[in-house]
Amino acid sequence: AGGDCISDVEVEQEILHLAAEYNVLQFAYDPHGMAHMARRLTDQGLEMMPFRQGTLSMNEPTKLTEKMILQKELQHGGNPVLRWMITNARTIQDNNGCVRIAKENKDSPRKVDGVVAMIMAIGQWMKFDIEDNANKSVYEERGLRV
């Protein structure tokens, strides 16, 4: 499709393709502006898990992600785009000491979306009870890769 917009149908097809290819069990998404797509993906059999972007949802996984990075427990295969986004990311702390990731300036063209997606994935991983899954998780043997 050409033009200035990416088709929702194309995005949905790519999500479903990647979910099948990588055996995605759950898909975390920011519910803001995604209700229709989430419903359609649910109808296609993908388990959609709302994951808000505020400090309440992002605090624990952000702190764990930072710890895992510092302890060299995360591998991203040298992905230059994720590395660039990590350099753009800033931690914002609220009055309660809870943190989330943001850009230095909300109008900045420097992106952090990949970092936020990584933190959301780690947040879902934190919620996922391995013992409830009949299959052994690959993460138990090789660790988490983003």
Task: Name each model-derived stretch.
Residues 131-146:
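Acidic, low-complexity intrinsically disordered tails
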Residues 7, 11, 33, 57-61:
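Helical mechanochemical/support elements of P-loop NTPase systems and associated helical scaffolds
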Residues 1-26:
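Nucleic-acid-processing active sites and adjacent nucleic-acid-binding tracks
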